[in-house]
Amino acid sequence: MFRNFKMVSYVVFGRGCFNQLDGILARRRRSDDSFMVYMVDDVFQNSRLKNKVPVKNKDQLIWVNVDDEPKTTYVDALTQQIKDSSRRLPDGIIGIGGGSVMDIAKAVSLMLTNSGSSANYQGWDLVKNKAIYHVGIPTLSGTGAEVSRTTVLSGPEKKLGINSDFTVFDQILLDPELIAGAPKDQRFYTGMDCYIHCVESLNGTYLNAFSKAYGEKALGLCKEVFLGDGPDSDDKLMMASYCGGMSIAYSQVGICHALSYGLGFVLGIHHGIGNCIVFDYLEDYYPQGVREFREMTERHDIHLPRNLVAGIESDKLEKMIDVALVLEPLWENALGVDWKQIMTREKIRELYQKM
C-alpha cells in the first residue's frame, strides 16, 4: 500500500516574510483572552529578532536552550510550564530557531493534548490526539524539521523521533533573511544534514520517483551553495532544506543518521556535526557522496573532531550500538531487507571505533 502522508498545510517563502507572522496568527486567535506561545532559540535574546516577534497581550515568549540535544525531560518541563500558566490551552505554538527548537516546539504542541511523558510517544504513530496549531520558522536551514513528521528527542532509553502525522507543522515561514547571520561552522553542519539526507535517500532501497525528484533538486542546491558562490545562497539553502525534507518524507535516511543517533544519545553530540563525523567514515557505502563532502569541508575550512570514541567505556559503546539498531527502517532503506546479515553489531562497533 502506498503511503498517504501529511504535508505542511501552508507555506510562505521570501525575504522579509517574517513580517507577515502577525497577520497569519491573527486569524488563529480565538478571543482577546487567548494567547500564543513563542518558543525562540535563546541565542536571539539580545538580537534584533527579539523585537520583531509579534507578542500580544497575554502571549508568552519562552527562550529555549538547545546547548544540549532535545530531551524528553525538557519537553515535558516546558509543556508543564505552559499548562501551569493558564487554565486554557494556547491558540498556537510558534517555534523560531534551528531544527532542535522546531522539534521542541512540535513536541510541546503534541504534549499539550496528549497525556504522560513525551518519552511514551517515541516511535511510529503512537500519538492519539491532534496537536494544537503550530508554526515553524527556521533560523538555520538543513535539518528539514520544518516539513518533517518527526520530532527527534533523547529519552531515558533511546534517541528516537515522535513520528506522527500530528507532528507536522500547520504553517511554516521560510525567510532567508533569518539564516543570513548563522555562524560558519553551524551553517555548514546543518547544511550537511540536508546534503546527507539526499545522499541517503537517493541511494536507498525505498527510493521512488517522488523522493527522487525532491532529493535530486535538494542535492543540486546543496552543491551550488557549498561548492559554489552566489548572493542568493541563503535562499537556495532554505529551499534545499525544504526539498530534502520532502524527499525523505516518502523514503528514508540511512546508515549515517542511524549511527549519528547513537553518538548523540551517548556523547551528547549535536545532530548536524554528528552526521558529519559519521559520514566521513562511510566511503564504502556512499563513495561519491563522501568524496563531495570532503571537498566541501576543505573548501569551507571545516575541521571535524576526531578520536571521540577512542577509550570509551565498553558499556557506553554497546549503548551506542543499541540506539543505532533500534532504527530499523533506516537500515532497511540503506541495505535492504537482509540488512541484519550485513550490518552486524561487530560491524557497527568497528565503524564507531574509527570515529
Task: Label the model's feature ranges.
Residues M1-G92:
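ATP/NTP phosphate-donor binding region
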Residues K6, R294-M355:
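C-terminal charged capping/lid subdomain of soluble metabolic enzymes
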Residues F18-D22, Q45-L49, S100-K106, G144-V147, ...:
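Short glycine/serine/threonine-rich phosphate/pyrophosphate-binding segments
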Residues T73-Q81, R87-E177:
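Glycine/threonine-rich beta-strand-loop-alpha-helix active-site module
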Residues G142, G245-H270:
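Glycine-rich phosphate/pyrophosphate-binding beta-alpha loops
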Residues T151-Y250:
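Carboxylate- and glycine-rich phosphate/diphosphate-binding segment that chelates Mg2+/Mn2+
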Residues Y261-H300:
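Catalytic phosphate/nucleotide-handling subdomain of diverse soluble enzymes
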